[in-house]
Amino acid sequence: TLLIAERCEVEFDTKANYMPVFPTPEGEDETSWLIKEVASGLAYRYPDGVPDHVRKQADYELDVIISMGFPGYFLVVADFINWAKENGIRVGPGRGSGAGSMVAYALRITDLDPLKHGLIFERFLNPDRVSMPDFDVDFDDRRRSEVIDYVTRKYGDERVTMIVTYGTIKTKQALKDSARVMDQPFSMGESLTKALPPAVMAKDIPLKDIEDPAAPRYGEAAPFRELIATDPVAKEVFETAKGLEGLKRQWGVHAAGVIMSSVPVIDVIPIMRRLQDGQVITQ
């Protein structure tokens, strides 16, 4: 494995665009179809006639969206959100800077009239600050998997993947794991973890800080230092645990993240299939 690692040469193209391509009707491209969908959406939102200031805002946003190359992004997001609504899946009304877009309101991505509520489009997409648009989308968690299945069928399972997460070994886990693999009784791990200072904001003191006088919580760790100073076995467990802290312990799947790509994901990043259900996940 070392030989293989030394032969690997990886370069990331950070400027490449892998946004999924939205399938448009014959004779249309993403830009022309977005313009038509927005016009149809405005008529739906304003059945008594589209006010001039609303149309002006929508036209301005379309110019920005098209010039920045994001028509497909809006079409893709609108498609799976509206599919969810049409299939009785609860969808949030809109959250974050995306709620400031009139185009998003017309496409039913959001359900908040941005002009009525004084929301600003430029917080979401600004030609002077080139960055990807980012809609915060909320689905009923009980049926979220149906939306993922929909986009997987539409764009292909080789282009849709879940995102891996890695759990790291924290302070208490490192102590307990070390005690266990060193064939120490369960009480050894318990006594060490109970001697630690109380967690602050759900975070335990790092093991390296326990013996570092310059560390901010060094003084609170006096009982722990006393324990390892008087018990050679506890000291050995502690030293072993320092080598484990921060290492990856297990992998999981991100609760909300899904990647959609215009090319097979395997051509861009390493992936794997979960044994239980065959779900594709990034590595």
Model-derived regions: residue spans:
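Alpha-helical scaffold/interaction cores of sigma-54-like transcription cofactors
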Residues: L2-Q283
